Amino acid sequence: MVVSAEVIRKDAVFHVAWILGTGDSKKLSRREILDQNLPELCHSIIEMVPERHRGSATKTGLYLLSLLTYGTVLIHQVQVDFLKRDVEKLKELMKKKSFILLMAERFDRNQELQRKEDKFARLRSKPIMCVEELDRVDLAHLQAIGDELGINGNPGDFIMMDALPNMNQWIDNNSELNAIYGCVEPYLREKEITMHSTFVEGNGSNEHNKERRNDAVIADFSQLLFPEIPEITLGEKFPIDVDSRKRSAILQEEQEEALQLPKEASEIVQEEPTKFVSIALLPSETVEQPAPQEPIQEPIQPIIEEPAPQLELPQPELPPQLDAIDLVTIPASQQDMVVEYLQLINDLPDDENSRLPPLPKDLELFEDVILPPPAKKSKVEEEEDALERARRRPSSRPVTPINQTDLTDLHSTVRPEDPSFAIDSQIHDVLPQRKKSKRNLPIIHSDDLEIDEAVQKVLQADYSSLVRKKEDVIAKIPPKTDAVAVLMNLPEPVFSIGYRLPPEVRDMFKACYNQAVGSPVSDDEEDEDEEEEEEYKYAKVCLLSPNRIVEDTLLLEEQPRQPEEFPSTDNINPPRQLQENPVFENLEYEAPPHPIRTARTPTPIKDLKYSVISLFPTPEKRRETSIIAELNLDPIPVEEIDPLLTMRTEEELENVRRRQKSSLGVQFMRTDDLEEDTRRNRLFEDEERTRDAREDELFFYSSGSLLPNNRLNIHKELLNEAEARYPEWVNFNEFTADHDRKKAATAFEGLLLSLKNMKVEAKQEDPYFPILVRHISHEEM
């Protein structure tokens, strides 16, 4: 037998799981999903799994089982989402409660706890016999007494009341035992009895059987126990102290107010015990004609409610709808029987041992006395009946709602029929098709995927030597609160630490600005007017040394100085700015060895030397001074310094065309007419100084990228150099020392490509250290 998809879809257990698993467009309500029993659903799916080597068993396809399993997972997910949403709403609702409501709830909770504490303080275990008559008990009958009362009958169970703890002490001292075995069960007998039952439920006896225990308590043990002694005799023969009287008064109050335990007697017919709350006797003259007049003010309630000695437990209360019953509401056919029964009760003697007469068998007092249900309840029942009739109708078409309100009805569709596992005459092979997921899932390769050896080597290569941490690469600049002397020792330019220097030092190193050192470069072939060209200014940054500005003066060597004309260098004080600043107190000021003067004379003087001033005696400055002294440079006369001579001379047109295709060079607009370009350059020679590409240290403009052939040639140069010097390492920094910036960047790009293609290997010891490159020989590999 084969289970088809149609049978599973109509099954009441798999209906919701099938809809969710197949992605059906039918909408399910919240109640339908929450009503699903997941353990039962999983058990049903397991039962449908076919077993091995059993051809006659019910066969269910793996595809159907997988859909049901997937639907079960979706049901669990939706149920968890509903629970999470409800908890969040409840949490928000609790947050919105006002402070007054919270205080009111806390006050009510404290009142309830106080009431329970007062009740436990008054609660004591209930006695079962009098302590004064304990010696008269026949120990031979003790086992029978224990069996009837529901205790083990051990003599240790009869203990004096003063040796027993109260309820609070019992809970505090035996909390663990209470959690395992239960609490003490009270058994009520007489008023002045002071013996207690101290056994615990679950100790091997049959105390947990409430019906048997109630029958035993209600039964009469006069044959086994001693005869009861009146209170007067007890008082004369065995005086009772004041505390026992107080406890007996408390027990009497609890009997009248708190205790409401069920009571069933073995002699009474197995019917619900009756209790008349407000019933009054009428004279015999008015019984035949009941009227709503005032009843006689002699109630029989005390006689009925006072229990007999054998029945110590109170009667259970009647339902609330029977509290207001009067004789007028009793049917006419039952009134005579009720009056006769009440007359029998009235004629009973005033004896505590007297019992109520049995109820007449034909008395049906409360069968027809049923109050009409509320209007709202009747309306709900009518709606449920209508929905049930619509659900059980033979038609399979769902209920068509009449208005918009019924559209949200949870029972607007037909309940699926019971599953029938009979073999279908026509099994439809058309299974529901799920839509393809729109998510871009990653491609899962097979296990036998072959990877090229070169790719494996690249993936396994260790480039950790080229990776540096950010902390190692970033320049570590001292904080702003460092001393100026520490800043002076740094080999960094002024512009990187100038903002941390005091104003007195910053005034000594001012940057100068050169005007119009370049103009924008465009690759457009169209000519632009000269008026549209904008001039750009660039900042010139100097190192930590005074600006060397050549003026129209000559350095004159002073004649042999006289002692009185020039003071000693030992008495020369540092500048006023350095004296006022306390930062420079510990700095050493070195005066110039040969004081010089400037004179505006065109007469050159031979044998002139540079004079060096060491402003701050730092190691870098001392090294710079020693280098300048070793060079022994001759000063250049001012008339020989011509800025126009430093400009670029005229070049051939072919060289200009080749240079314009390079990446670095501050050039003008590229045009086809090179003669016009040359003429335009001459116009700017008188107004501004055109800087060469190598002189521009900060900014450059590009006239276009390198041609592909030039780019590949630069890459090939590095490979050829590394292959020629194999197995030695090639210093990449020295290799690109003579290159311009863009050519060096292109060479570095070739280095990265060669590393990726495993043609070369590189290493670098520390940041800012030279990069060493070596050719990789694949023959050795």
From Swiss-Prot:
Its main location: nucleus. Residues 408-418 have a biased composition (Basic and acidic residues). Phosphorylated by air-2 in vitro. Disruption phenotype: RNAi-mediated knock-down results high embryonic lethality. F1 worms have an extended lifespan, an increased incidence of males phenotype and improved survival to toxic oxidative stress. Worms have defective meiotic chromosome cohesion and chromatid segregation. It comes from the Eukaryota. The modification Phosphothreonine is found at residue 625. Residues 397-407 have a biased composition (Polar residues). Keywords: Chromosome, Cytoplasm, Cytoskeleton, DNA damage, DNA repair, Meiosis, Nucleus, Phosphoprotein. Residues 374-418 are annotated as: Disordered. GO terms for molecular function: chromatin binding; damaged DNA binding. GO terms for cellular component: chromatin; chromosome; condensed nuclear chromosome; cytoplasm; meiotic cohesin complex; meiotic spindle pole; nucleoplasm; nucleus. Expressed in premeiotic and meiotic gonadal cells. Expressed in spermatocytes. InterPro entries: Rad21/Rec8-like (IPR039781), Rad21_Rec8_N (IPR006910). Plays a role in meiotic chromosome cohesion and segregation. Necessary for sister chromatid co-orientation and sister chromatid cohension until meiosis II. May also be required for repair of programmed meiotic double stranded breaks. During spermatogenesis, likely involved in spermatocyte centriole cohesion, thus preventing their separation during the second meiotic division. This is Meiotic recombination protein rec-8. It comes from Caenorhabditis elegans.
